[in-house]
């Protein structure tokens, strides 16, 4: 074979001549990497495999819980159920059917997570569609699956801090792995051979990069092998005769100790994290140095205590300040000042700083403070205000500078503001109430603190009145009004009924005194506006309708309220709602409807009264806006019953709308008095099958349908019954009086509706018959019909001798009215079709000369002519009607004269 086809090697090992046949060295078919030579094959049991699969799935579940990926969490839970089903034979065999503790822990954590996410309704709204759907499916599947683990979960809940099986397994694995690593690092000293393959293994252990050598093994490789063999020989002899076992045991002990230390540090870190979570994110300031108290032999006086106080308070607001430690220092400083008897001024200064430090303890202003801090805050403020009231020579004011403070001689001057502290206290109390569940005992317990808060405000009122600052007096008066205006005082009604002496003071008298002072002395519009609104609310709450109405009309608040801040607008809405209820109790149906129509027309009375947030679409309200609106919500005990408001509004609309609809049944230009009530009525009429009423709205709609036919008894039964009494009418103070007023108005409006509806049927109708039909006195029926005739609502005349109502046929009949409506609608349709046809023609640029202009002028002239004809016809109809009325009047006069002549 030629040298060209042979392709010999160019390396130094090719030293043969050209005549000799060239042998090409073949590469081995299978090469083993160094890793494959070193790694030992580990045989694991079925239990280890199954438990490892379960632990991996549990880790993924915990990761998905952190990021709230519900769809992935659902799929991982399904994987967990399948993996547990696979591991069940192993569990029954190895664990005697007892479920491992790490699985129970994972199920308990998953249950807590699902319940937490499900209870967070606001957070659920922000979930995506896929995540919310997956959350519902996960909750259903989990509740079904967890029934088999009820007993195990109960045992786990009793002692959740015990160690898991998974942790033990991991510890064993770590120990085994560490032992394997030690065995791999230190070669065994038992079987040391001097063969070539062992030498190659030692070489591989020394240098892993040498495994990538070329395939050509020649003389150089042999020489390398011989040299490495000699080195390995010496190394193996050294290792063979070296003492290892004792040292290795010592190393193992040291490593085990190190592992224990690392585990202890990890456990301590975990505990620290749990404590940090319990403290709700409080930072521990280990870096900041503790300010040292006084030396043992130091002479403690006022200046030294004040300097130390300033030193402690200098760290206020800084990043690494330990707030808890700061409060402890201040209390210790107070104890020292009391022990040394440094005076009331120093004690007041220290107590005021303690109050400020407690306020600073909560860094987030939007969140309420803890209950333990709240109780301490109440104690400190009560002690401070008692100290200020007992020592009249102490002046605590924000106008005093730090340089001008005086602690040695009276009058003592201290920089600070007691009013600001009490306002902050009141705000914190409101935040605590908002945070509690309103239907729990916790809310009742917190509400009991209002007595303490109002007592503190009353004491601060005395202190501020003693100082004589009018602006601060207005501010503290308004705080007192805020706790007083929404509370009902039964002594007001007792005093009105002369059941109490006239000299007794009631809440109305107190509100009058406080509000009059603010009206006269306040220099800001906001305080005066809030005082007027609270005054109106309190008057309306105690049925002082005329005083409340006059205040609203004189203040012109409805014109300027749009420029006020949101809390003032919320107070305005609450005031108008309560004013509407007061008007309804007094029987002023129109006024009640006008007060409530603005609230109810929007369909969002809950939001306008700050009594909760209505769920909206995702883009309508951002998270920041929702957070701000939550801060503006009113506490639950100040809420106005929304169902009561809606019922009063719908009943008022029914009493106004039904007679109006009957009077203008065929009027094409009829306007709606209440759009909301009209929609409720129309939606009920569109239903093919209407059952008995159940909700409050259905009761009002059924009553409206009965009133349209003049059936006042059915209408009254729908409005006033056992179910409606429980839901609505029993919530009023004098419920029986309200029910009597309702029955009277239903009878009167049903009579008006009956006359409007059936006036074209009767020629005359007897007044006693109407009085008997509607259970009204004859005088009331007579006055109602007279008003209708005077207001030109009913074309009729009263015949007093015969006590009859003579009805005139001046109105068109039903057929005539319908034909007139049809003619109007057909005319409008023709006009609109002509306009559409002209727009579609598009011949605007093909007219000759002034053709279009002439036609427009002709149309305008025709319209004017039609309008004049319509006016003439209307005048003629009015003249004919007047002539008919005069003729009827003359006939009645003639009949009366004839009747008198016959009687004589």
From Swiss-Prot:
Which region is the signal sequence?
Answer: none
- Has the keyword Cytoplasm been applied to this entry? yes
Which spans does this entry mark as compositional bias, Basic and acidic residues? Answer: 194-206, 237-247, 874-904
* Residue ranges occupied by any PCI domain in the UniProt entry: 636-812
- What cellular component GO annotations does this protein have? eukaryotic 43S preinitiation complex; eukaryotic 48S preinitiation complex; eukaryotic translation initiation factor 3 complex
Q: Summarize the protein's role.
A: Component of the eukaryotic translation initiation factor 3 (eIF-3) complex, which is involved in protein synthesis of a specialized repertoire of mRNAs and, together with other initiation factors, stimulates binding of mRNA and methionyl-tRNAi to the 40S ribosome. The eIF-3 complex specifically targets and initiates translation of a subset of mRNAs involved in cell proliferation.
Its name, as the record gives it, is Eukaryotic translation initiation factor 3 subunit C
What is the originating organism of this protein?
Culex quinquefasciatus (Southern house mosquito)
Taxonomy of origin reads: Eukaryota, Metazoa, Ecdysozoa, Arthropoda, Hexapoda
Corresponding gene?
eIF3-S8
């Amino acid at each position: 074979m030629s040298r060209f086809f042979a392709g010999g090697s160019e390396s130094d090992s090719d030293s043969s001549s050209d005549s000799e046949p060239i042998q090409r060295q073949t590469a081995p078919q299978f090469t083993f990497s160094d890793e494959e030579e070193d790694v030992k094959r580990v045989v694991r049991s079925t239990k280890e495999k199954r438990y490892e699969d379960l632990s991996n799935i549990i880790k993924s579940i915990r990761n998905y819980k952190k990021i709230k990926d519900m769809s992935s969490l659902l799929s991982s839970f399904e994987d967990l159920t399948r993996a547990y089903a696979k591991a069940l034979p192993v569990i029954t065999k190895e664990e005697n059917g007892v479920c491992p503790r790490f699985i129970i822990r994972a199920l308990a954590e998953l249950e807590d997570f699902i319940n937490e996410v499900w209870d967070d309704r606001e957070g659920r709204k922000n979930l995506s569609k896929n995540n919310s759907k997956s959350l519902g499916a996960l909750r259903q599947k989990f509740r079904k699956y967890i029934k088999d683990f009820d007993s195990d979960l109960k045992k786990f809940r009793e002692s959740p801090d015990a160690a898991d099986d998974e942790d033990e397994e991991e510890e064993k694995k770590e120990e085994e792995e560490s032992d394997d690593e030690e065995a791999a690092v230190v070669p065994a000293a038992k079987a040391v051979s001097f063969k070539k393959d062992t030498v190659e293994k030692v070489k591989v252990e020394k240098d892993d990069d040498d495994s990538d050598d070329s395939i050509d093994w020649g003389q150089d490789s042999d020489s390398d092998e011989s040299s490495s063999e000699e080195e390995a020989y010496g190394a193996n002899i050294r290792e063979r005769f070296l003492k290892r076992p004792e040292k290795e045991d010592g190393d193992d002990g040291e490593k085990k100790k190190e592992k224990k230390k690392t585990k202890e540090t990890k456990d301590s870190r975990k505990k620290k994290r749990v404590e940090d979570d319990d403290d709700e994110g409080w930072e521990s300031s280990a870096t900041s140095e503790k300010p040292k108290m006084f030396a043992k032999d130091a002479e403690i006086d006022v200046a030294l205590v004040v300097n130390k106080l300033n030193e402690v308070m200098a760290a206020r607001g800084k990043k690494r300040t330990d707030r808890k430690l700061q409060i402890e220092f201040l209390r210790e400083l107070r104890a020292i000042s009391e022990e040394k008897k440094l005076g009331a001024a120093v004690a007041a200064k220290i107590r005021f700083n303690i109050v400020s430090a407690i306020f600073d303890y909560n860094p987030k202003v939007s969140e309420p403070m803890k209950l333990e801090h709240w109780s301490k805050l109440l104690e400190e403020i009560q002690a401070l205000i008692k100290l200020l009231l007992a020592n009249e020579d102490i002046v605590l004011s924000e106008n005093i500078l730090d340089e001008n403070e005086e602690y040695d001689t009276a009058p003592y001057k201290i920089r600070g503001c007691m009013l600001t502290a009490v306002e902050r206290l009141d705000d914190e109390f409101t935040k605590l109430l908002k945070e509690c569940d309103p239907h729990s005992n916790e809310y009742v317990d917190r509400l009991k603190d209002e007595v303490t808060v109002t007592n503190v405000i009353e004491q601060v009122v005395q202190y501020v009145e003693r100082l004589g600052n009018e602006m601060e007096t207005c501010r503290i008066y308004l705080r007192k009004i805020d706790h007083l205006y929404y509370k009902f005082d039964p002594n007001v009604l007792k005093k009105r009924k002369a059941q109490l002496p006239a000299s007794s003071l009631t809440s109305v008298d107190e509100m009058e005194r406080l509000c009059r002072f603010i009206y006269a002395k306040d220099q800001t519009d906001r305080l005066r506006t809030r005082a007027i609104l609270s005054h109106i609310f309190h008057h309306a709450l105690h049925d002082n309708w005329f005083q409340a109405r006059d205040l609203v009309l004189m203040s012109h608040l409805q014109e300027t309220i749009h420029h006020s801040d949101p809390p003032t607008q919320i107070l305005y809405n609450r005031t108008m709602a309560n004013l509407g209820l007061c008007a309804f109790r007094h029987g002023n149906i129109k006024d009640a409807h006008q007060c409530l129509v603005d609230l109810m027309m929007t369909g969002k009375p809950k939001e306008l009264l700050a009594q909760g947030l209505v769920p909206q679409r995702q883009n309508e309200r951002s998270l920041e806006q929702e957070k701000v609106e939550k801060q503006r919500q009113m506490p639950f005990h100040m809420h106005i019953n929304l169902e009561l408001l809606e019922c009063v509004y719908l009943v008022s609309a029914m009493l106004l709308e039904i007679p109006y609809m009957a009077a203008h049944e065929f009027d094409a230009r009829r306007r709606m008095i209440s759009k909301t009530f009209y929609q409720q009525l129309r939606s009920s009429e569109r239903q093919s099958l209407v059952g008995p009423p159940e909700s409050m709205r259905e009761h009002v709609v059924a009553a409206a349908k009965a009133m349209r036919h003049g059936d006042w008894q059915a209408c009254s039964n729908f409005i006033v019954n056992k179910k409606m009494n429980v839901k609505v009418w029993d919530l009023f103070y004098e419920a029986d009086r309200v029910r009597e007023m309702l029955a009277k108005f239903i009878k009167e409006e049903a009579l008006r509706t009956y006359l409007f509806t059936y006036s074209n049927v009767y020629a005359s109708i007897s007044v006693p018959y109407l009085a008997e039909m509607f259970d009204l006195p004859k005088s009331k029926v007579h006055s109602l019909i007279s008003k209708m005739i005077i207001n030109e609502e009913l074309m009729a005349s009263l015949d007093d001798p015969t006590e009859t109502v003579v009805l005139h046929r001046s109105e068109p009949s039903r057929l005539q009215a319908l034909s007139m409506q049809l003619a109007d609608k057909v005319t409008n349709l023709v006009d609109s079709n002509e306009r559409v046809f002209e727009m579609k023609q598009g011949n605007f640029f093909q007219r000759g000369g002034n053709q279009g202009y002439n036609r427009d002028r002709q149309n305008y002239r025709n319209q004017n002519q039609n309008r004049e004809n319509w006016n003439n016809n209307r005048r003629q109809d009015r003249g004919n009607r007047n002539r008919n009325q005069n003729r009827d009047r003359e006939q009645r006069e003639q009949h009366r004269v004839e009747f008198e002549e016959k009687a004589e």
